Amino acid sequence: DLWEFGKMILKETGKNPFPYYGAYGCYCGWGGRGKPKDKTDDRCCFVHDCCRYKKLTGCPKTNDRYSYSWKDLTIVCGEDDPCKELCECDKAAAVCFRENLGTYNKKYRYHLRSLCKKADKPC
């Protein structure tokens, strides 16, 4: 769920997720293609896109909402939630953003997707 993912990012990084990551590089935000621009784009967004693509099995496509909570500043995805795997993908990306704040480059914010060429590596 995009809203829940945004809340995870905000709490992990202290950054507003939509302007900060909504159109960053070649993979952050809607759709993704081309060669990732840096560790934030590659390790976080590219891996997140691949994770969500691979984890769509048990979660209804019409409703990808999931439950989660915080325990000692750690995201805990709902154990019996049918969308738990998607929650885990979002959690991993939010933590990745925090761990890679130092690689964030403002020049890739609002990056034109037309500049993103064919991907060098598949999921």
From Swiss-Prot:
Protein origin, superkingdom: Eukaryota
Binding site for Ca(2+): Y27, G29, G31, D49
Cellular localisation: Secreted
Cofactor note as given: Binds 1 Ca(2+) ion.
Predominant cellular place of this UniProt entry's protein: secreted
The enzyme's E.C. designation: 3.1.1.4
UniProt GO molecular function: calcium ion binding; calcium-dependent phospholipase A2 activity; phospholipid binding; toxin activity
InterPro entries (alphabetical): PLipase_A2 (IPR001211), PLipase_A2_Asp_AS (IPR033112), PLipase_A2_dom (IPR016090), PLipase_A2_dom_sf (IPR036444), PLipase_A2_His_AS (IPR033113)
UniProt activity-regulation remark: Inhibited by divalent cations different from calcium ions (cadmium, magnesium, manganese, zinc), since they act as competitive antagonists of this cofactor.
Tissue expression as described in the entry: Expressed by the venom gland.
Enzyme class: hydrolase
Coiled coil: none
pH dependence: Optimum pH is 8.0.
Thermoactivity: Optimum temperature is 35-45 degrees Celsius.
Catalytic residues as annotated in Swiss-Prot or TrEMBL: H48, D90
Disulfide-bond pairs as recorded: C28-C45, C44-C96, C50-C123, C51-C89, C59-C83, C77-C87
Reactions performed catalytically: a 1,2-diacyl-sn-glycero-3-phosphocholine + H2O = a 1-acyl-sn-glycero-3-phosphocholine + a fatty acid + H(+)
Xref: PANTHER family: PHOSPHOLIPASE A2 FAMILY MEMBER, PHOSPHOLIPASE A2, MEMBRANE ASSOCIATED
Protein name: Basic phospholipase A2 Ph-TX1
Organism: Bothrocophias hyoprora (Amazonian hognose viper)
